Amino acid sequence: MIKIGNIELSSNVILAPMSDVTDLEFRKLVKRFGAGLVVSEMIASRAMIMKSRQSMQKCAIMHDDPTSACVQLAGCEPDVIAEAAKMNEDMGAKIIDLNFGCPAKKVVGGYAGSALMRDEQLAAKIFEATVKAVKIPVTVKMRIGWDDNTRNAPTLAKIAANSGVQMVTVHGRTRCQFYSGNANWDFIRTVKEAVKIPVIANGDITNFAKAKEALQRSGADGIMVGRGVYGKPWLISQIAYYLKTGKEKPAPSIAEQLDIITKHYDAIIDYYGKSVGVPIARKHIIWYSNGLPSSAEFRCTVNLMKDPIAVKEKIAEFYMSVMDANK
């Protein structure tokens, strides 16, 4: 089983950090479906040390489980990232993850995210400063490189490991690919061969078969699932079961899905409040209902609704209609 420092994961299937997706309530939900580790949304380190409302909300964690208390930080200033890491440790974080993989122009333009892969000396300073600042494990998530001519993930992983970083996750694309083409799981094997710390494969892992193939081709210790869980938080459980038994675990029934989405919806409203919670919940409602009969009409209706009680009633009405149609 994977160990990050002295923290042992119960599963080698991990939830990826995703901006505006992996908030506290979504992480709680996916953790209940058996994720070995759940990671917060990316948090800008400078905003963190300034204690902006948004950054403080993003770093909220579950204190009862160290594998639910992993906070991802982004930035390019070693001292600022180190200070933000220490702040999170003081607030209860058990793992700090460093973002060296985000390809977004806004992030890269600030010389953070995957832009850091272009400056190995700066990367080393960030690793060293962060590891020195905290007593908890530090991990990093990166891409295979900036472009096809600079696929330096193996080198950067070595620098990270030599600096005391305890786990490396690699998304199998370059920054210049963004999310186009296919994830190069084979290249991740070169990272695995370069270091002795755990290596996690990420990218295009959307079902059982791809999860198994990613592990086999990469030789990685585990996999990280991202966009595949949109509307399917139970996918983590299905993948873990398949990797363990070789058997496919069915998705929840429509009735069970209604229960999941209703509880998730209630949690969002309780956490964010009505005015903020409803817009946040809408994107999850869209993902949950995708592919169900008459879901397009349902989504159009919900997107125009603002009253939280009315939205909840509409969710129940829609899922009941799907169940009736299946009788």
UniProtKB/Swiss-Prot annotation:
Residue ranges of coiled coil: none
UniProt-listed Enzyme Commission number(s): 1.3.1.-
UniProtKB keywords: Flavoprotein, FMN, NADP, Oxidoreductase, RNA-binding, tRNA processing, tRNA-binding
Major enzyme class: oxidoreductase
UniProt-listed InterPro entries: Aldolase_TIM, DUS-like_FMN-bd, DUS_fam, DusB-like, tRNA-dHydroUridine_Synthase_C, tRNA_hU_synthase_CS
Cofactor(s) this protein cannot do without: FMN
A Pfam family: Dus
GO MF annotations in UniProt: flavin adenine dinucleotide binding; tRNA binding; tRNA dihydrouridine synthase activity
Catalytic residues in the record: 102
Sequence positions that bind FMN: 17-19, 72, 141, 202-204, 226-227
Catalytic activity: a 5,6-dihydrouridine in tRNA + NAD(+) = a uridine in tRNA + NADH + H(+); a 5,6-dihydrouridine in tRNA + NADP(+) = a uridine in tRNA + NADPH + H(+)
Gene3D superfamilies in alphabetical order: Aldolase class I (3.20.20.70), Putative flavin oxidoreducatase, domain 2 (1.10.1200.80)
Family: Belongs to the Dus family.
Primary role: Catalyzes the synthesis of 5,6-dihydrouridine (D), a modified base found in the D-loop of most tRNAs, via the reduction of the C5-C6 double bond in target uridines.
Name assigned to this protein: Probable tRNA-dihydrouridine synthase
